[in-house]
A protein has these predicted regions:
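Short alpha-helical transmembrane segments in multi-pass integral membrane proteins
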Residues: 1-23, 81-148, 190-246, 302-367, ...
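N-terminal transmembrane alpha-helices
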Residues: 10-47, 61-76, 80, 105-112, ...
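Transmembrane helical elements of multi-pass membrane transporters/channels
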Residues: 21-40, 142, 153, 176, ...
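Transmembrane alpha-helix boundary and packing residues in multipass membrane permease domains
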Residues: 26, 30, 42, 79, ...
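Helix-terminus/linker motif at the lipid-water interface of multi-pass membrane proteins
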Residues: 35-54, 123-130, 186-193, 249, ...
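Interfacial/gating helices of multi-pass transporter permease domains
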Residues: 44-64, 131-135, 195-196, 237-244, ...
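Small-residue-rich hydrophobic transmembrane alpha-helices
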Residues: 53-113, 150-169, 263, 276-334, ...
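Short runs within selected transmembrane alpha-helices of multi-pass transporters and secretion channels
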Residues: 74, 143-161, 169-180, 198-213, ...
Length: 458
């Protein structure tokens, strides 16, 4: 297998260095995605009108739900490709690459069709304001046309990440994102368009990023190359990608539902508290995206080393990733506690709102580090091909538990602190259960690998 294209060695060298170098481009990619998504909202609000701003904003939940599934498929591709690469199975890699492209493309087309056909009913279900509904429906339908391209880009990003190549997807996303901002300005300012112009810009940029990554894969000379003239399709590979990718997205969807109950609790308080909660919640996306990059590295390194039969390095990859994730959560959370008022002043001018936001940050600031144990362990379990049980555990521990907390602990104390503390407790409980499960199955996995190796050598 040609490994020259693999920019970061996963099965040899310093794990401390390689995991960090693998994660940094992913962190930048995550931050860029947040910034480019914000550009849609900012340009719609600044240069169009409040209807355009509201229309784009009212589709956020649905867009996040559907794009989340597409991103999840990319993570499934990443884990399976990394495992086959680690095992030195060139044909298995080819089957994974081509089967994954088929699966991701189908999922992307299905997501597009659902949004095209059900955009208005779904937005009505979310109680979208009548004055915003026509523009919101138009935006969602146009935006959905880019979902097949988004699925293909995430497929390609998953393949390249499995190779240890995380810089190239960052470059492609940067190019497409810059075009997105430029087209947003062109369609809205020069053409006088509103939400529809913003959606068209997004679709064009998504197809550009997909085209760039597909062209690169077609030009590769190794087993990760796309060969349109050959048929490398495997039902097993298709099933594996689905089993690895879908549970994580179901988990995120249930998280969103559980957080609606938390928001209901917040809404029991005055407008200042609600505004402070909203302002401080902006920190979540930043810190979780940084940690998510490390968790992707964790799954990739574990899967790659598992394929290579290197159990000790596999476990060390977990502990190194966990250390980085914990450090990121602790350091960034600590900075938020220290400089929280300055951070909140970016979103609010009212002193009372800032102080209300600090109530949340003072608890969440040290809770992000706790979350690292949960999320990193889930990623590690995914790296060894285990997704169903971790998903059930996180649904029970971090979702069902939150709903129960709201109707028991919070209902008893009726304080905002008692509500915010549910994050810390739910993450701690879930992390404990996930770690017990991971260490149990990883031990069994090691014994199974050793037995298989002995049988082959006999």
């Amino acid at each position: 297998m040609n490994t020259k294209t693999c920019s970061i060695q996963m099965t040899s060298g310093s794990l401390w260095k390689n995991i960090l170098m693998f994660s940094l481009p992913l962190m930048l990619t995550q931050v860029l995605e947040v910034l480019f998504n914000l550009s849609d909202v900012a340009i719609a609000g600044k240069f169009a009108d409040y209807i355009a701003l509201g229309a784009v904003g009212s589709t956020t939940l649905l867009v996040s739900l559907f794009t989340g599934f597409l991103i999840g498929m990319g993570s499934g591709v990443n884990v399976r490709a990394a495992h086959r690469l680690g095992a030195g199975d060139d044909n298995g890699v080819r089957l994974t690459v081509h089967s994954s492209l088929l699966v991701c493309s189908i999922i992307g087309v299905l997501a597009c069709l659902i949004c095209l056909l059900l955009a208005e009913p779904m937005l009505n279900l979310l109680k979208t304001k009548s004055e915003l509904l026509p523009s919101a429906v138009t935006y969602l339908r146009i935006y959905s046309l880019g979902m097949p391209a988004m699925a293909v880009y995430n497929f390609g990003s998953g393949v390249l990440s499995a190779c240890g190549e995380t810089r190239r997807p960052l470059v492609y996303l940067s190019i497409a994102g810059a075009l997105n901002v430029a087209l947003n300005l062109f369609f809205v300012i020069c053409c006088g368009m509103a939400a529809d112009g913003v959606a068209i810009a997004s679709v064009i940029s998504q197809y550009l990023s997909a085209a760039l990554i597909v062209i690169h894969l077609c030009r590769r000379k190794d087993c990760c190359a796309l060969s349109p003239s050959r048929k490398y399709i495997s039902r097993r590979a298709c099933a594996d990608v689905l089993m690895l990718g879908i549970p994580a997205r179901i988990q995120n969807a249930v998280f969103a539902v559980a957080n609606l109950f938390v928001q209901t609790g917040v809404n029991h308080f005055d407008a200042i508290t609600v505004s402070g909660n909203s302002a401080s919640a902006n920190a979540d996306a930043i810190i979780f995206n940084v940690q998510a990059a490390i968790h992707t590295a964790c799954a990739s390194f574990i899967s790659r080393n598992r394929g290579a039969g290197n159990h000790s390095r596999m476990m060390k990859s977990y502990f190194v990733s966990l250390t980085y994730s914990f450090a990121a959560g602790a350091i960034l959370g600590g900075l938020l506690i220290i400089f929280g008022r300055r951070f909140l002043s970016l979103f609010a001018n009212d002193t009372a709102v800032i102080e209300a936001g600090m109530e949340r940050l003072s608890i969440m600031g040290w809770s992000y580090a706790i979350a690292s144990f949960m999320d990193c362990t889930i990623a590690a379990a995914r790296g060894i091909g285990k997704t169903i049980v971790p998903t059930i555990v996180v649904i029970m521990g971090s979702c069902v538990f939150r709903v129960v907390w709201v109707y028991t602990i919070f209902a008893h104390f009726q304080t905002i602190t008692s509500l915010y503390l549910l994050y810390s407790f739910s993450w701690a409980i879930t992390a404990t259960a996930e770690m017990v499960y991971f260490f149990t199955v990883s031990r069994k996995d090691r014994f199974a690998e050793e037995k298989s190796a002995l049988e082959k050598s006999a």
